[in-house]
């Protein structure tokens, strides 16, 4: 049963950002509290980003809702997320996409996220411990790719794993600020479809730890 607190959180999000009905339903279906570290449980239903281990953060639920909606979610099947973190974004995506693939480079976060997702019975979410810059070639091509960390550029490996005509949404570092951009793949190259808004994400880092 979905909690009143989670419902009220979604109401607050909707006041700030008009939610697609599918995104709102997905956000209401996933209890954020499950993904929040114990010391911050009392902040679970605020719109704040919250600290996790390994100098990482669970994104604001407002940000999660926006990033999900920016993917243009109608008539799509698969999505690859770069940066699983707590697993919250992947869980929300699982309510919309038939298949969700998420890569995490920090082993402790990967193990915790995998356990949470399994406990929730989200069998359509697949999580891998690996360098996100390399994507997950085994199940490519993907209809959508979502970066949950800020990139300086999009690696060719990920462009190759995106379906022709597919959409990639990523925070991009530009000079001294980050901006969320939506790209579309055309003729095997990415074209900026829209610059969406300024943002603040942890950076994409090479390798694993």
UniProtKB/Swiss-Prot annotation:
Q: Which InterPro entries match?
A: PCMT, SAM-dependent_MTases_sf
Instruction: Give the gene that encodes this protein.
Output: pcm
Key word Transferase present: yes
Record-annotated active site: 59
Q: Name one GO molecular function term.
A: protein-L-isoaspartate (D-aspartate) O-methyltransferase activity
Instruction: Supply one GO BP term.
Output: methylation
Entry GO CC: cytoplasm
- Organism expressing this protein natively: Helicobacter pylori (strain P12)
Q: Family, per the entry?
A: Belongs to the methyltransferase superfamily. L-isoaspartyl/D-aspartyl protein methyltransferase family.
What CDD domains does the annotation carry? AdoMet_MTases (cd02440)
* Localization terms from the record: Cytoplasm
Q: Which UniProt keywords apply?
A: Cytoplasm, Methyltransferase, S-adenosyl-L-methionine, Transferase
Instruction: Write down what this protein is called.
Output: Protein-L-isoaspartate O-methyltransferase
**Function field:** Catalyzes the methyl esterification of L-isoaspartyl residues in peptides and proteins that result from spontaneous decomposition of normal L-aspartyl and L-asparaginyl residues. It plays a role in the repair and/or degradation of damaged proteins.
Its UniProt entry gives the catalysed reaction(s) as:
[protein]-L-isoaspartate + S-adenosyl-L-methionine = [protein]-L-isoaspartate alpha-methyl ester + S-adenosyl-L-homocysteine
Q: Which PANTHER family match?
A: PROTEIN-L-ISOASPARTATE O-METHYLTRANSFERASE, PROTEIN-L-ISOASPARTATE(D-ASPARTATE) O-METHYLTRANSFERASE
Enzyme Commission code(s) on record: 2.1.1.77
Q: What Pfam families does the record point to?
A: PCMT (PF01135)
């Amino acid at each position: 049963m979905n909690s009143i607190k989670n419902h009220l959180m979604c109401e607050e999000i909707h006041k700030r950002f008009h939610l697609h009905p599918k995104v709102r339903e997905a956000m209401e279906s996933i209890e954020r509290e499950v993904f929040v570290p114990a010391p911050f449980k009392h902040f679970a239903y605020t719109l704040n980003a919250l600290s996790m281990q390994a100098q990482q953060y669970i994104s604001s639920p407002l940000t999660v809702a926006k990033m999900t909606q920016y993917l243009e979610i109608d008539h799509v099947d698969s999505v690859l997320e770069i940066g699983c973190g707590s697993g919250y974004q992947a869980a929300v995506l699982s309510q919309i996409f038939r298949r969700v693939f998420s890569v995490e480079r920090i082993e402790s976060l990967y193990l915790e996220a995998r356990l949470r997702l399994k406990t929730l019975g989200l069998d359509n979410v697949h999580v891998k411990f690996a360098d996100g810059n390399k994507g997950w070639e085994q199940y490519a091509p993907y209809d959508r790719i979502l970066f949950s960390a800020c990139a300086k550029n999009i690696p060719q490996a990920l462009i190759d794993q995106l379906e022709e005509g597919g959409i990639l949404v990523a925070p991009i570092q530009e000079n001294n600020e980050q901006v969320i951009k939506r790209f579309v793949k055309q003729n095997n190259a990415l074209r900026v479809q829209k610059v969406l808004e300024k943002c603040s994400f942890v950076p994409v880092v090479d390798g694993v730890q």
